[in-house]
Amino acid sequence: MDTQPIRLPSVAGATRSAGYPTRPPLRRFLTDCHEEFRGDSSGELADYIPELKRANPDHFGIALVTIDGHVYEVGDSAVPFTIQSVSKAFVFALALETVGEERVSATIGVEPSGEAFNSIRLTNDNRPFNPMVNAGAIACSGLIYEVDGKGAFERVRSKLSEFAGRELGVDEAVHASETATGNRNRAIAWLLRNYAVLPDDVDAVLDVYFRQCAILVTARDLAVMAATLANRGINPVTGAQVITPHIVARTLSVMTSSGMYDYAGEWTYRVGIPAKSGVGGGIVAALPSQLGLGTFSPLLDNHFNSVRGLKVCEALSARFDLHMLNRNADVRTSVMADYDVYGISSRRSRQPHEQQILDERHSDIRIVELVGALNFGTIDYVTRRLTSEPPNAPLLIIDFRRVPDITAAGAELLGETLTALGNANVTTILSGLEEASAVWAAIAARTGDPRRLRRFALLDDAIEWAEDQVIYRFGGFTDVKESVHLGEQALLAELDTDEIAAIVKLSTTRHYTAGQRVIAAGAPANSLFFLQSGMVSVKLRSGVRLASLGPGMEFGEMAILERTRSADVFADTPVACLELPLDSFADYRRLHPETALKIMRNLAAILARRLVAANAKVDLLSAY
């Protein structure tokens, strides 16, 4: 095998035309790889199994599956071939699942052998070197046979089918050919039996092994199987949890050290992606959390690896810098924002005395927004930032809405930190987490008493709850059931008693029950409302809450400026309010122009405050 760096195909630019490009860049790259390497006819067909020598040397297929289940296919990706030694990785995973890690480790080692894959040799303690050589693979089949007996192969075929996301069959001709010519494997099996690694029925175990090698797959199947390993054991196409993350890690480890026969060291150096090859011409490569790759080309090099498949893997890794040991993640990027509520607030509108408390005590509420999948390194940084950096706010909100996953180690560190914060009288509120969230489940399971944690699905709800605590602690609590005098309405500020009485005379008292719609989006805007008691929410048609209003506040006031309602308003509690028709208000403006001017100035001030608050939020987000 030529070990000099290969020439990488360039990512060809798409012809410019109206509309979006028809092919994603990754598909164009894979197509270029196929065009670049299909002319390479070096290598030989496997001949030690006669049936494999019948393969078409021109076949060349590439498939790549992302962990969100998108499938790229180029060339002969749907041509079936026998899985051969690629099966070893997945049967090893099945053995771990079937008999447990302790039993597998006692039977099979995990060290590279330094010898040919079909060497008739064991370690000094009479174990196969690893599950990727024939001796180790046969031992794996033996472990499964001990549990399932005659059903062992069906268990293997069924599990590999789960990995592939479809039912897989067997090439009976290849199975017969392997059985007829597999004397070297028989020698290995009897050596294993001599040291009690295999049960008595050696021939039955060998038949399981020969059959698993003769399972028919395509390059697409291999890519899906690899992506399942890359996706922590979840098949990204079917969504099924095929194997546990713990077993995935052990499987990928052995694939890294021993998966590419005696080219494994060079492979790790050049490509750096856990992989397994087979003499049928297949290669499977799994890059954790990113992709699964499957290639098929039956021409093999002197290490029994597919010539074209190797070149595809090397080109992909080099072009997109996919080597697993060349990672550039910065733990500091896990904190998207860290701020208090100075200049910002929840969507809950506050009375002036309440807002004054929040303005004075803004540093009592700290908000930390996290982003990305969280692991040991990122959570260590987050926990140090939470516990060692000022300000030491009594109310801490940690937002997880941009966090798709957290590892067990990360959840362990975070759980300990949340417990310590609780013991230090810090009230911790977690937002962006639904009840059924896996992230919430992982954190709650590792927190001393999860009942001490407050959890909200939305960050705004968490901020509103924290604001309520600050207001209540400093004597500003408002009972929404109590009616507020109209003179406390911001829209009617500076109006005297007679002017307010005139407004009341033009208005009608309305009552609404909790959940009742008060204003419908799209309806004519022909009145405005003064909320006397209760709570209402202003929502878009999508259900997104724009504001929450309490006693002493107005809503529907934009009717003064526009004629169509832009949002819904719902009563959150029993509500009492005054409705002022716009026609009546228009008459009032003509009769009392100076009073109307005060109201319009108040409306301008209200809108200005909203704009300032919106700008503060934009500035905050722009700072991170």
From Swiss-Prot:
GO terms for biological process: glutamate biosynthetic process; glutamine catabolic process. Residues 43-325 are annotated as: Glutaminase. A nucleoside 3',5'-cyclic phosphate binds at residues 491-608. One of its GO terms (molecular function) is glutaminase activity. InterPro entries: Beta-lactam/transpept-like (IPR012338), cNMP-bd_CS (IPR018488), cNMP-bd_dom (IPR000595), cNMP-bd_dom_sf (IPR018490), Glutaminase (IPR015868), RmlC-like_jellyroll (IPR014710), STAS_dom (IPR002645), STAS_dom_sf (IPR036513). It catalyses: L-glutamine + H2O = L-glutamate + NH4(+). Residues 355-466 form the STAS domain. Substrate binds at S85, N134, E178, N185, Y209, Y261, V279. Keywords: Hydrolase. Residues 1-20 are annotated as: Disordered. Its EC number is 3.5.1.2. Transmembrane segments: none annotated. CDD domains: CAP_ED (cd00038), STAS_SulP_like_sulfate_transporter (cd07042). It comes from the Bacteria. The keyword Hydrolase applies. Homotetramer. Belongs to the glutaminase family. PANTHER family: GLUTAMINASE. This is Glutaminase 2. The lineage of its organism: Bacteria, Pseudomonadati, Pseudomonadota, Alphaproteobacteria, Hyphomicrobiales.
